[in-house]
Amino acid sequence: MNSSRTRVAVIFGGRSNEHSVSCVSAGSVLSNLDPDRYDVVPIGITVDGSWVLGSSDPSSLAISGRALPSVDKDGTSVVLSADPTREGEVISFDGSDAGAVLASVDVVFPVLHGAYGEDGTIQGLLELAGVPYVGPGVLASAAGMDKEFTKKLLAAEGLPVGVQVVLRPGIATLTEEQKAELGLPVFVKPARGGSSIGITRVSNWDGLDGAIAHARLHDPKVIVEGAIIGREVECGVLEFPNGDVKASVVAEIRMPDADTDSDAFYDFDTKYLDDVCEFDIPAKLDESVSDQIRELAVRAFKALDCQGLSRVDFFVTADGPVINEINTMPGFTSISMYPKMWNATGIDYRTLISTLVDTAIARGTGLR
């Protein structure tokens, strides 16, 4: 490695049910890290939590047909030192080489989606280690991962959000009063999940308990949301090294079956495997509506005290935009909306990745 260049650890995989999506995102990031500026240390986390030196070959992290990639344990076992005096050392944990320093990294790009990665946990480790990292800090990551607290924080800032009921462990189902408040249809979701995994659209109350049980396979805390009727759009937010925060163009997701299939929604297979959705980037909205969405996206970013990046998802209703969710580490796959929106805004993928890394280094770690 050339010591004059920045060493970037790209961490991917992880213990969440979004393991494979993380791998695919990492493949795209590895393909777009500027080789003239960066040396890369790929670190994969297996589904059971083992850290290994991963492959730097992006093709090994691609979707093949409907087969999803994963991290296996074939690589060298490693740990990232949590001791800040070790300055980002990646240390071998393998056999006779145990204890050997394999690399010292300057910054981490945690391309991790879901639990044990996007929820403040990896961010806490990196804060302890004193290693700068791409994306929001511990608080924003934890709050952004939990749909209950995301909406509570956004609502406290006067931002428009939908109606939700939280079913904590031990609460089996909705009361009749809650059903009346929400109406039908509803969406039943794991409270701390992503990529639409574990989500069910319920059009009849007879299906509610099964949907709750399905969501609880992924999270003991469940959210039941009243359906919002409107166009589904997204907006990317990006922080620059000088601290400026800007919003991308707005993009719209169009489900081709939405008019004929009342149960159609943007689920995991639709996002990553079926290639049936249509996208308008930029969305075909009145300029005033797009400007309002972009303003709300930046306000949501700041309300959660985000840094680096986020993607904010909206429904455009007859009464105006409503924030559905905020994603603090959006997908970076070749079909992901976040890089596509920024490309349409005038920032290509490679420049986007460089901006995120530069912003992370400029921000540093610790209280700030």
From Swiss-Prot:
PROSITE patterns: ATP_GRASP, DALA_DALA_LIGASE_1, DALA_DALA_LIGASE_2. GO terms for cellular component: cytosol. Mg(2+) 1 binds at D313, E325. Its main location: cytoplasm. Its EC number is 6.3.2.4. It comes from the Bacteria. InterPro entries: ATP-grasp, ATP_grasp_subdomain_1, D-Ala_lig_Van_CS, D_ala_D_ala, Dala_Dala_lig_C, Dala_Dala_lig_N, PreATP-grasp_dom_sf. It is found in: Cytoplasm. Binds 2 magnesium or manganese ions per subunit. GO terms for molecular function: ATP binding; D-alanine-D-alanine ligase activity; metal ion binding. Residues 151-358 form the ATP-grasp domain. Pathway: Cell wall biogenesis; peptidoglycan biosynthesis. Disulfide bonds: none annotated. Its cofactor is Mg(2+); Mn(2+). ATP binds at residues 179-234. Keywords: ATP-binding, Cell shape, Cell wall biogenesis/degradation, Cytoplasm, Ligase, Magnesium, Manganese, Metal-binding, Nucleotide-binding, Peptidoglycan synthesis. GO terms for biological process: cell wall organization; peptidoglycan biosynthetic process; regulation of cell shape. Mg(2+) 2 binds at E325, N327. It catalyses: 2 D-alanine + ATP = D-alanyl-D-alanine + ADP + phosphate + H(+). Cell wall formation. HAMAP family: Dala_Dala_lig (MF_00047). Belongs to the D-alanine--D-alanine ligase family. PANTHER family: D-ALANINE--D-ALANINE LIGASE (PTHR23132), D-ALANINE--D-ALANINE LIGASE A (PTHR23132:SF25). This is D-alanine--D-alanine ligase. It comes from Rhodococcus erythropolis (strain PR4 / NBRC 100887).
